[in-house]
């Protein structure tokens, strides 16, 4: 199993503001959906997120369609039946290895927030791949991605990930994929 981190991050490491995204970039949302839903036939991907990330998703998009939704929270008191709630990232991984899920899960995607990103990057049991939308400017944020040295990561060129730079709604951005070396530390 590999842990895949999906993140849009500004040059000042920002990922969120006021419980939501600090930008509206349709192309990034399309990238997120494509990356997290593309699975082998007969399988589904799992998206693992913290409570605040779950709560930031508009009701009309809950659950994230065609994916197994797992929320990591010790305080979420009630959740719809279509969502699995677990107390930790390790519990989420254990759940995905149980009989109910192990035969239907293709890839696991960590989609936020900070604590889960940090745990995924810090652990050394599973290989980590980062699918990143680099927002090529500093953005006013109150939630941040753990700092990594992008130059120490192995850039991965995938045929379905565009190498171009795009501009939308005043934000210039590009998509990149990185493999995190096992000796990477956060």
Swiss-Prot record:
Its EC number is 1.5.1.3. Substrate binds at residues 28-33, 67. Keywords: NADP, One-carbon metabolism, Oxidoreductase. One of its GO terms (cellular component) is mitochondrion. Signal peptide: none annotated. It comes from the Eukaryota. This is Dihydrofolate reductase. The gene is DHFR.
